[in-house]
Amino acid sequence: NLYIPLATTEGALVASVSRGCKAITDSGGATADSYRVGTTRGAVFHVSGLVENDKLNTFLLNHFKELQQVARQTSGHLKLTKFFSRGLGRFRYVRFVFDTQDAMGMNMATIATTSVSRYIETNAGVRCISVAANYDVDKKPSWLNIIEGRGMKAWAEVIISEKTLRETLKAT
C-alpha cells in the first residue's frame, strides 16, 4: 500500500481521488514518465531594423558560450542550456532556457536573463526593452510551452477496463 497525503475541506474530492486510485490499481497500475525541459525567461530587444535584427541573431549564435558564462555567474545552481530567437520587425524576442536543477528557478532565470541582457546590450549595441516579454509565457497556459516545453514535463497513462469504468467509476 502507498499512502498519498491529501488535505482538503472538500470531502467529495477525497472520495473521487480514492475511486480514481482504486480504478488505477484494479487496472494494473499506471505508467508515468517525466523529464526536465528547463525554466524559461523571454526577453525582447529593440533594434534599428531588419539588418540589425539579423546581426543580433548572429551575435547570439556566435556568443552562446559567453552568454552561458554570464548566466552561470549569477548562480551556481543555474545553467543556460539553449535559447530560441525570433525576429519581428524592429524587435528580437529571445527565449532563454535554463536548467535550475531541483528549483522551479523563476527568480534565478530572471536574474540571469537580466545579466545576459546587459551583456548583449553592451556587446551587441542593442537595447533590451524587457526581460519578461511574454515569450516565456509564465503563469498561463500556452501552446508554445507545450511545443517547446517549459519546466518539467510529466506524462501518465492507464488503460481502464470497461468493467472498472462501470463498477468503480460509475461511467459507461
Ranges and model annotations:
Residues Y35-G42, K82-T114, R118-T172:
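A structural signal for small-residue-enriched, beta-sheet-centric alpha/beta enzyme cores
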